[in-house]
Amino acid sequence: MAHDETSFDDDSPREACGVVGIYAPGQPVAHLNYLSLYALQHRGQESAGIATSDGERITVVKDMGLVSNVFNDRTLAGLDGHLGIGQTRYSTTGSSSWRNAQPVYRGEFQREFALGHNGNLTNTEELAQEAGMLPGTITSDSDLVAELIANQIGHESNHNASDGRELERGLVKILPKLEGAFSFVLMDEAHIIGVRDPNGFRPLCLGKLDNGWVLASETPALDIIGAHFVREIDPGEMVIISATGVRSIQPFPVERINPTLCVFEFVYFARPDTQLYTQSVHHARVRMGQFLAKQAPVEADVVMGVPESGIPAAEGYAKEIKIPYAQGLVKNRYIGRTFIAPNQELRSLGVRMKLNPLRDTISGNRLVVVDDSIVRGTTTRAMVKMLREAGAKEIHMRISSPPYRWPCFYGMDTGTRSELLAANLTVQEIQDYLDVDSLAYLTLDNLLEATGTNNAGFCSACLTGDYPVDIPVNLSKKILEESIHKPEKSSATQREKISGGIQQSFSEIHE
């Protein structure tokens, strides 16, 4: 009998990914990567992986699950080296499977490299066809990029003597062909390389250790290992870290540079202790609540936030409107993102496994309930029912972002437009569907002002439908896996040979 997997995050955008790269001679780089990935666990919980090099070979360990599930003292001890990269993954192109776990490894033409990716390419099918790749042999956009780079390195190896900079030159050739969202960390035996797409959809920053350098998706990944924040990697920038220090080059045409950081990094994705555009994410979320209170005040007894990312906005709302803030929902911190339930009756209990009401806060009170977003509405509706049962007199829902009406193709998994509640219902209809006494969303202008960045440049396509990079009509999460043909056996066998080194390393370490 088939069991269904029920998500606890139906009313929030699904995670992006987290990447880290560390160059630190004399330091336990595998352990530093492990700690930094812990700080980025919120960005992806499907799989985790680390690749390291001792200057002669690359070793990769990756598996499905959380960072703490994949790594232990024994696996980390097997990851020798003074440089390494890591990734926590949530699938946005390609299914959730070991084959698509990262870092992606290639070892052809006597040149090894590994790649970690946060984002989502929008021209994958075009790139695969241009490269003459057999449909079905590439199952994620990250794997596709690695294949393109490997082919370019192979082409150069046939015409030039090796000087150790083949990966850098291969990237300079391949990167201008890529469209969409990508923050990459890459490594060969001697270099760590970081790349941010010309729009800067996903964050990437540079930090300094006493004896090395760090690249990471968010600043807490620097803090946890004692690295000092230096700066954000600019949109369209490529940085190369080696024994000689840090170099920066611009591999993209200047006309493609158009900073549009995903605004939902401020709303939901990033940790509250992250700095983006030099601004505190936590303080930005508090300001969102303050703007929301000015925009949509209501008479109430208590303001409460939906854990976790709704809490700072709720605190800001309460402060501005001068109504007491109180915790009204307790989150089970040890529940996974999904659980397996055999029938609808048990599936309907999903929200109760994640959240439990504090009746002393709720019973007999008029509540303002603040959350960061509503995507599908199923979890919010179940939560409202739970609050009613706990004795709420009134429930006024306040959302610290505008209505989520359009799917994201730049590194978030939001489903199709038909699944998005605000794309199909008016605000009044959503209010009726949720069974709340009132509903209000923060305006886009107020959201952007709350970030405190002086309109530094944001993508808000999921709110407006204005996509900064063109989207193919047939783009989907599994576009590379849903190709016309399955790979022939000979090609599949060849791919096993190509990736055999990484699989052998993985199995040996986990024996």
Cite the ranges covered by each PLM segment.
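PRPP-dependent phosphoribosyltransferase catalytic core
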Residues: L175, A190, G226-E232, K385-E511
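Flexible loop/turn segments at secondary-structure boundaries
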Residues: V29, T92-T93, N123, I193, ...
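Conserved short alpha-helical segments that host acidic/polar catalytic motifs at enzyme active sites
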Residues: M1-P235, I240-A300, V306, E394
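Secondary-structure transition/capping motifs at alpha-helix termini
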Residues: H155, Q295-D301, K319-A326, T361-S363, ...
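Generic beta-strand/beta-sheet core signal
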Residues: G116, M187, V195-R196, G207, ...
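A conserved beta-strand->alpha-helix junction
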Residues: D143-L148, Y325-G336, Y433-T451
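Phosphate/diphosphate-binding loops
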Residues: K173, A221, H228-F229, I233-E237, ...
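Short, glycine/charge-rich flexible loops or terminal/linker lids adjacent to PRPP-binding catalytic cores
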Residues: K322-V368, T378, R405-D413
